[in-house]
């Protein structure tokens, strides 16, 4: 049976894992790293993903896309995107349906597409390790992702050629990895501060039963925000000193971002670091400007103190929703790279009143949990039951624009709930159901998930028709809504898609494009490997010809030189088949050179042997079988 893989699709880095026997195993990528940068870049002739995309970001900032998870499932007019638009070197545009898309090399891409390119990279990593095709996956999302964001993540999996068996919340996945072998009953808080999002989840673990009690968070709070605080500080200090605004230079901005991320990481273990960026800009006099600045841990903490405190409020809300106090928490588990920051650890310790658990790798534990869930779905992991919750309330807009909840936040999923509504006007023959998700009292203040009509209602006074509205949330947290006229039996049901979102046709087109690109990528890789093989063969053959050409007849030398010349000509083209043909011709011609070399050596050895005196040969034999040696051996045996 083919393996189901677990993927942590992160804002900054992604990770893939599988079940290896009874334990999850993180798979290293082609570069030997256990996590892969969630970065995609477009050059003139190829698309890059992962470390190769990150390496060229400084020289190609406008076409290098990162942090796309913060865009997924979001509208172009989202207030959170306004500040990001100013700070990002690449362009965020309207996808034509009101969704936020990105632009690179003149083409527009949905966040689901960019995420799909990252998922393809993770898929290839797993396939390379397993030696077989992978078609199914469990993918993680922030617990506080809404329906549109979950659906967009599932779309990304489909575009990448993966059947997404389950969308699982990141803190819940981390809890699975933490509690897999624990038998005693424990109540834990998972504090997950990653590259772009923050979640806190309260769970009860009891001998294989993982029950989520509550979840809270912020899908626009993470390491990217910490980085931008450092970037803005560096840019301001540089502007004060040199009267040059680096934020207007996309290449300089990308260099600052990389320097900020590096400094942030270093300050988790050091009290001070130096940021050194030579030739970062040009002065008004044409002279190059360099950035050399010191950044202390204390200064970093003052820059991001409010961001850290912003993560504590959801912790209090999650405890309240779970009906628990801080003292009821047995263990606090830290997840996400930002939890390595000492100030974050201090604030979490201060709030919960206990030292956090440090027994899990914050960068890998989510992927490991996804692999465990994959094992559960595949039947390889027994006695594990996961009960998750929906993070936000769901309902419909009723008379006066009021948000009427059908399913409250932190309801265990999967779940189904029905409620009877009626018409607002006399003789109303149709109703429009507008579905929202959120916690505000007025529908317009919440996130609209979609809308649909129920038509054919018989004329009747207002309040008489009975319309049953049913909400159904599956284990992925994705919503279906139905409406039924109890009088006529007419009903309408839809799986909610955001008012933007990708249509089935969009997804199919992107799947085809991904498949075509995969074929093109394979062809390009084949060309590069064939070209390398040809160049190596040319070099080796020319060297052999130079050293041993006199040992073969001139016609053989001429044949080899002709074949080499033809192969060099094919190397000027991008025709893989022609290059392979040239390799074959040179190999066959060079074989005669090899045969001649070995024949010449054999003839030389034979001539030397024929010229050796018989007595000398016998003398050598006598020296080998030495009487004294045999006597000594006998003495040892007797001893």
From Swiss-Prot:
GO terms for molecular function: ATP binding; ATP-dependent protein folding chaperone; unfolded protein binding. Residues 514-554, 603-639 are annotated as: Disordered. The modification Phosphothreonine is found at residue 197. Keywords: ATP-binding, Chaperone, Nucleotide-binding, Phosphoprotein, Stress response. InterPro entries: ATPase_NBD, Chaperone_DnaK, Heat_shock_70_CS, HSP70_C_sf, HSP70_peptide-bd_sf, Hsp_70_fam. Induction: By stress conditions e.g. heat shock. Residues 612-633 have a biased composition (Acidic residues). Residues 514-529, 540-553 have a biased composition (Basic and acidic residues). Belongs to the heat shock protein 70 family. PANTHER family: HEAT SHOCK PROTEIN 70KDA. HAMAP family: DnaK. Acts as a chaperone. This is Chaperone protein DnaK. The lineage of its organism: Bacteria, Pseudomonadati, Pseudomonadota, Alphaproteobacteria, Rhodobacterales.
